[in-house]
């Protein structure tokens, strides 16, 4: 072997993919990081994806490939991409290769970990079921989240996934003692900037003292290589807190679909034959390798919340469909509900959770949740009749069901603290026991006399009563 690191020469550049020729016997391993010195302290990192034969490798660039020329020198680092881990990352913004992008100097860390790692073995995993209270009525009641579980937020364009994630950060990360890692994968840079400023204002990020969150970004403007790997960077930082510090970590990923999308952009350039809908043939494997690492072990837990963009509102598209298989709880945001003006636009009949089980949530919660779903389902099946014949043709019992369902539907809406600037309504956080009690009372008909408007955009049932009195006073 040679004394220094092996070096090769660029042979071809095709978009985000670079072919590099090495000397005999100096071939870098798959997933190794290669670097190209671009002058003025700029280094471009590539990751080896394929061996082409004839001592050539095909690598994916983690940044733009503008300005590269054939014959330029490429150095093999001899190891995968590694990123700083530990408390030095808290309060900082990091890119895919672990460099700070917040212009606040280098990151102080004693350790760097490779972004590719094996998932914890089956023996190490923990399987306890415990509900994570979010303070969002529709979630806590109908599709509760698991502490240390995986949660998916599914929705098309513009139905409120990012606002929902921000509300969860607001409700859980603030009340939660441990650390959080927020990973922005292929989403809007503006939203990342807003989030950072908001976290500074609320003290989640403290520039002087100890912060509670590390931010990792590879946004829409980045090349596909960065977007396909930045989720792993964020996960590596979260894994360190889980395994080395025994923490309960919150991992937010916005958006996991962009991870798949970036993989499909690169896949064609790597010469793989596409599978269904043009996705990469390795779609399920890529997703599995990522998702299996996001798990709770005996050392600590990772509770992950992932936003999943649904292309063209089609939940059967291979990308969202593959993601469904990995999750404990799914919150489906629906365009139909957002068009009714009900926010959060959660579909109460489509959202599911593994925890909605008598043995986990208890009999009362289970009965109220199923009662709410039955009422809404009955209303859904009566909607065609109402559309054709009108309300007057329904039986008295059906009329009552419809009235209650419309109240429940409105009562599932809730003002968010993070949306206060847009709505002008103060955000509300509702405790689980209050949610169960108030929906139970609505199902029992105790509030049949109140107008349905009173149930819209409020917190608990006492707010409904107050709003009803206000409506009555205005009417007189």
Curated annotation (Swiss-Prot):
Positions that bind ATP: 156-163
GO molecular function, one term: ATP hydrolysis activity
Principal location class: mitochondrion
SMART domains: AAA
Membrane-topology annotation of the record: Peripheral membrane protein
Catalytic reaction list: ATP + H2O + 4 H(+)(in) = ADP + phosphate + 5 H(+)(out)
EC id: 7.1.2.2
Compartments it resides in: Mitochondrion inner membrane
Pfam family, one: ATP-synt_ab
GO cellular component: mitochondrial inner membrane; proton-transporting ATP synthase complex
Biological process (GO), any one: proton motive force-driven mitochondrial ATP synthesis
Annotated signal peptide: none
Site (Required for activity): 351
InterPro entries the UniProt entry points to: AAA+_ATPase (IPR003593), ATP-synt_VA_C (IPR055190), ATP_synth_F1_bsu (IPR005722), ATPase_a/bsu_AS (IPR020003), ATPase_alpha/beta_chains (IPR050053), ATPase_F1/V1/A1_a/bsu_N (IPR004100), ATPase_F1/V1/A1_a/bsu_N_sf (IPR036121), ATPase_F1/V1/A1_a/bsu_nucl-bd (IPR000194)
Subunit-structure text: F-type ATP synthases have 2 components, the catalytic core F(1) and the membrane-embedded component F(0), linked together by a central stalk and a peripheral stalk. The central stalk, also called rotor shaft, is often seen as part of F(1). The peripheral stalk is seen as part of F(0). F(0) contains the membrane channel next to the rotor. F-type ATP synthases form dimers but each monomer functions independently in ATP generation.
PANTHER family: ATP SYNTHASE, ATP SYNTHASE SUBUNIT BETA, MITOCHONDRIAL
Family: Belongs to the ATPase alpha/beta chains family.
Protein name, as recorded: ATP synthase subunit beta, mitochondrial
């Amino acid at each position: 072997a040679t004394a220094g690191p092996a070096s090769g020469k660029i042979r071809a550049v095709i978009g985000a993919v670079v072919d590099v020729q090495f000397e005999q016997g100096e071939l870098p391993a798959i997933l190794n990081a290669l670097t190209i010195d671009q002058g003025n302290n700029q280094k471009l990192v590539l990751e080896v994806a394929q061996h082409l034969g004839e001592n050539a490798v095909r690598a994916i660039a983690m940044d733009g490939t503008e300005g590269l020329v054939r014959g330029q020198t490429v150095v093999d680092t001899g190891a995968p991409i590694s990123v700083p881990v530990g408390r030095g990352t808290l309060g900082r913004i990091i890119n895919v290769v672990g460099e700070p992008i917040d212009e606040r100097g280098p990151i102080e860390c004693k350790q760097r970990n490779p972004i590719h790692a094996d998932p914890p073995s089956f023996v190490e995993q923990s399987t306890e079921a415990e509900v994570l209270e979010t303070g969002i009525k529709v979630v806590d009641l109908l599709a509760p989240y698991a502490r240390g579980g995986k949660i998916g937020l599914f929705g098309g364009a513009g139905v409120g996934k990012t606002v929902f994630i921000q509300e969860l950060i607001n409700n859980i990360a603030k009340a939660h003692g441990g650390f959080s890692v927020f990973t922005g994968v292929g989403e809007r840079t503006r939203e990342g900037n807003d989030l950072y400023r908001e976290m500074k204002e609320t003290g989640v990020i403290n520039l002087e003292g100890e912060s509670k969150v590390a931010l990792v970004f590879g946004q829409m403007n980045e090349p596909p290589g960065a977007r396909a790997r930045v989720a792993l960077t964020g996960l590596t930082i979260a894994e360190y807190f889980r395994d080395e510090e025994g923490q309960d970590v919150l991992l937010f990923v916005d958006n996991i679909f962009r991870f798949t999308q970036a993989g499909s952009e690169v896949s064609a350039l790597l010469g793989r034959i596409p599978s269904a809908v043009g996705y990469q043939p390795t779609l399920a494997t890529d997703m599995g390798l990522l998702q299996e690492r996001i798990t709770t072990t005996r050392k600590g837990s990772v509770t992950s919340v992932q936003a999943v963009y649904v292309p063209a509102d089609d939940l059967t598209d291979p990308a969202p469909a593959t993601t469904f298989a990995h999750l404990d709880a799914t919150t489906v945001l629906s365009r139909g509900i957002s068009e009714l003006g009900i926010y959060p636009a959660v579909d109460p009949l489509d959202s599911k959770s593994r925890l909605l089980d008598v043995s986990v949530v208890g009999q009362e919660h289970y009965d109220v949740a199923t009662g709410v779903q039955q009422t809404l389902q009955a209303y859904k099946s009566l909607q065609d009749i109402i559309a054709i014949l009108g309300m007057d043709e329904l039986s008295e019992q059906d009329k009552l069901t419809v009235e209650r369902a419309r109240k429940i539907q409105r009562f599932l809406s809730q003002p968010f603290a993070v949306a206060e600037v847009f709505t002008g309504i103060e955000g509300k956080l509702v405790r689980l026991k209050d949610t169960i009690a108030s929906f139970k009372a609505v199902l029992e008909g105790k509030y049949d006399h109140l107008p349905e408007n009173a149930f819209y955009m409020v917190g608990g049932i006492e707010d409904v009563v107050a709003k009803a009195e206000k409506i009555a006073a205005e009417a007189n």
